[in-house]
A protein has these predicted regions:
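A short, basic N-terminal segment
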Residues: 15, 19-20, 25-29, 37-38, ...
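Walker A/P-loop nucleotide-binding motif
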Residues: 108-129
Length: 487
């Protein structure tokens, strides 16, 4: 019988708790949302002696987060929930501790880490882990994937625009959180007396004059003209007319300079990122963490674009390292702006880059204009490799145990520790048979989710031997031990 407080499962909405029953309609809380459903569509959760313990009161949101992360693993993408991301990363606790330690010493030692590996080695996953740890530790992150058609390092204005558009903020002590660059402008306005005298900020004709102009206007998200003016400061260079005309009408008469976008502009946009880092620190954040993936795109560039892209890489890498005296002044086509020598006054922001292995990454002593301008020291490079067999097996068992406790009664077969051990051992065996260079980690984490996925997709009962047989056959295919059409 279904009464208030009963834990139930719905075929479409998943696991929930009955809040009230009125006739044939039950109000059920599914993962934090109350829905009215037909009572006959609900199945009470039956707990066997071997079943994993049900979630404690208040854990519904955790179950929901795991379900979303489980689906992400099955799709081969990175889970979005930071806590789940650490938990579902093989060696996640150790990796997060290492990242946290780097960030803690960033202001003195600088942080520039290049995650290298071939396709499927986990570069993007590690960068997502960096973002999760950085936000947890009070850093504001700016992340993007380089793209020759959108965020092109040969056109630093597009990279700057993408990074500012990808800002993510940690939660404040009072529970508030800025959502984007527009909210950051509100924070700056509220703390203008702190921001206006910052040394790099004062030397930036774009930030100093642009923000002074915005102070003459009301900060309103529903004012499209004002939003356009703010977007100019966020890298929408064509909105210069919006901020100039609005501020002029508001009483601000100082000429606001354009943000250049042609020729070599790397120095200008690197400086704007330094200013942004300075502002964030003044507002109480730990600073700015840049996270850039797909950096290998520049290999296909023409000569001039290649040089400009790597000049930009060179400058932001210097900003993330402790200063060096043996480097020449960076190239710039806009020296008349008279910027301070910020590239040798750091470290400033932190920098994390995902880079696919290539010939230009093997020689760390190459000259300016090569990919290795990002690398100042061999310790900057983290070569990603698949985990060892024992670590993979332990992770599979832990993942299956979490699935048994959080994915509902259909996967209660996995509550049996013996079955979980058999499945994990089966996966380890085939993982071990695969050459290290061919172990695409995303495939081997996806196959671990195959067992609960099979149970959740079937209406009838599946016994343990049948499930292990299905897992074994699928793992053989992933390991390349058989072709899909082989018997």
């Amino acid at each position: 019988m279904i009464v208030s407080g009963t834990q139930v499962e719905h075929a479409e909405y998943g696991i929930g708790t009955v809040l009230a029953v009125l006739g044939d309609v039950a109000t059920v809380e599914f993962f934090g949302e109350a829905l009215d459903v037909v009572a006959g569509e609900l199945m009470p959760r039956q707990q066997s002696k071997q079943a994993a313990p049900p979630p404690a009161r208040g854990q519904t949101s955790t179950d929901f987060a795991f379900r979303k992360s489980f689906e992400a693993v099955n799709l081969g993408v990175v889970p979005t929930d930071p806590d789940q991301l650490v938990d579902l990363t093989i060696g996640g606790e150790q990796a997060s501790d290492e990242i946290g330690s780097l960030l803690a010493n960033a202001s003195e030692d600088g942080v520039c880490r290049i995650f290298m590996g071939y396709y499927g080695s986990g570069k993007s996953h590690h960068l997502h882990l960096v973002k999760a740890v950085a936000i947890r530790d009070g850093w504001v992150t700016a992340s993007l994937e380089l793209d020759p058609k959108a965020a092109d390092p040969a056109k630093p204005a597009t990279v700057y625009q993408g990074l500012v558009g990808g800002l993510e903020f940690p939660m404040r002590a009072d529970g508030s959180r800025s959502a984007d660059f527009f909210d950051l402008i509100k924070e700056i306005r509220d703390n203008w007396s702190v921001v206006r005298d910052l040394p790099y900020f004062k030397r930036s004709p774009w930030f100093s004059k642009g923000l002074e102009a915005l102070l003459y206007l009301s900060h309103r998200r529903d004012d499209t003209d004002y939003v356009a003016a703010v977007s100019w400061l966020a890298g929408q260079v064509k909105q210069i007319g919006a901020i100039r005309s609005l501020s002029w009408r508001g009483g601000h008469k100082t000429q606001i300079p354009i943000l250049p976008q042609t020729k070599d502009t790397g120095l200008i946009y690197a400086y704007n990122l330094v200013v942004l880092h300075e502002i964030l620190k003044a507002l109480g954040y730990k600073g700015l963490a840049l996270i850039i993936d797909e950096a290998e795109h520049v290999r296909s560039y023409s000569f001039n674009r290649y040089i400009r892209a790597n000049n930009f890489f060179d400058i932001i890498a210097r900003c993330a390292h402790a200063p060096r005296k043996d480097l020449q002044k960076p190239q710039s086509d806009y020296e008349h702006f008279d910027l301070p020598p910020f590239w040798k006054e750091g470290p400033h922001f932190t920098l994390f880059v995902g880079l696919t292995e290539g010939e230009d990454t093997h020689d760390l002593k190459r000259k300016m204009g090569e990919m290795s301008v990002l690398i100042h020291d061999p310790k900057d490079v983290v070569h990603l490799e698949p985990p060892c067999e024992s670590d993979y097996e332990k992770w599979c068992e832990a993942f299956l145990a979490e699935s048994a406790g959080r994915l509902g009664p259909k996967v209660q077969l996995l509550a049996d520790p013996g079955l979980r051990a058999r499945i994990a051992a089966t996966l380890r065996h085939h993982f071990d048979q695969t050459p290290v260079s061919e172990r695409i980690l995303r495939n081997w984490t996806k196959i671990a989710g195959f067992a609960p996925a099979v149970l959740m997709s079937r209406d009838g009962a599946t016994n343990s031997d049948e499930l292990v047989e299905l897992i074994d056959e699928a793992a053989r295919q992933i390991a390349g031990e058989m072709l899909p059409w082989d018997d």
